[in-house]
Amino acid sequence: MPATGSSPSDVLIVGAGPAGTAAAITAAEAGLSVTLVDKARFPRDKCCGDGLTTLALRHLDDLGLDPSTITNWFDVDGAWLRSPSGREVFVPLPSDGRFAAVVPRLDLDDALVQRARSVGVDVVEDLSFVDLEQHVSGVAVTFDDGSTRDARWLVAADGMWSPIRRSLGMSPGGYLGEWHAFRQYVSNVSGSAASRLHVWFDRDLLPGYAWSFPLPGNRANVGFGILRDGTRSGKDMKRTWDDLLQRHHLTEALGPDAVFEGRHTAWP
């Protein structure tokens, strides 16, 4: 654990989400010494639809991640799409490989952190960025435990509201992103959503959509994403969520005994 008074790393990465762990694994496999720091302790959850596209799966293959080690991995064979008019179509995926999957971020991110450790990355949890100072041979980064870590290169993988980017004056003030999303896990799913990936393009959500992504054990990740246009307040978003959960095509897909777990999460 390189800290104040110890040898610097070649690469210091702040943020151990998929971007940070991918950078860490790639750098370590290239022969660089890598320290990966995150403010959380893993496993930890993130608001996400949990879907993995074909390109994401290929990247995970390149990183050496083994899907068989993740209990809550669910392979998807296609998608059921519902148009604003109510017409539904099934779009199959090729059957000769893995082209889409659903994996909770709780499990995926933790698996990537463990993969990083396995290739020699020094992973430090429960540590938050405070400040940085650039110098002739690299950068010195101060954390909330009072330690300073030196590195030749710093990778800011600390999210959309990156404290590192903000410390460098590179974050636009008041920017909340272009999209807003709600998500909640559902258990005891007995309808088609237990095994099918659904995407609903309801008219009032366009150009966004609602989804139900299947998970093992008759669970699903259910949510919606809409374009942030400045006319919808947080309360409006919550009303949209409550209304969406009453729509027939969604309740039918989940089944009559579906149970919503805990509370919903929103982003941003």
What do the predicted segments below correspond to?
Residues 19, 42, 161:
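Conserved Rossmann-like nucleotide-cofactor binding loop
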Residues 160-250:
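Conserved FAD-binding catalytic core of PHBH/FMO-like flavoproteins
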Residues 72, 148, 230-268:
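FAD/FMN-dependent oxidoreductases across multiple families
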Residues 4-19:
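Beta1/beta-strand and adjacent pyrophosphate-binding region of the FAD-binding site
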Residues 47-80:
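N-terminal FAD cofactor-binding segment of flavoenzymes
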